[in-house]
Amino acid sequence: MSQSVSESTRVNPDGVVVERRLTREGVHPFDEVEWEIRDAIIGDPAKPAFEQRGVEFPRTWSQNATNIVSQKYFRGQLGSPERENSVKQMIGRVAGTIANWGREGGYFASDADADIFEAELTATLLHQEVAFNSPVWFNVGFEETPQCSACFILSVEDTM
């Protein structure tokens, strides 16, 4: 009797089993899209409010998305070697961190399920089918204990 990869590398028999929907085994989601190098410039090109040249984005992403992502969500000091300059780095940082939290927490049925989850999350982010709120992009994979929510509900006294 043959076993699937998920069955042969069981981590948690009660864990989440993940099926591929958007990705193919052995093919990274980043290899499925066409990439281009662009410049992110906000404001007057002669005196920009923000500028990062040579950033890598999927061809399908707009220039507006390029400008916003480069300015707001790429991590690292602008001009430093640590500065992110590709959507691959940004999505990889976030999707990889979230998948690793699941691995460390024993959420997945197998290592293969964790890998599929990471690939599927990467694909949905890459194709802009889903998007996290800003604190996720700012902090996940960068801060040890990141703040991932943008809204806080405070108790309000009801005097009616």
Named regions from a protein language model:
Residues 1-160:
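Extended catalytic cores of very large enzyme megasubunits
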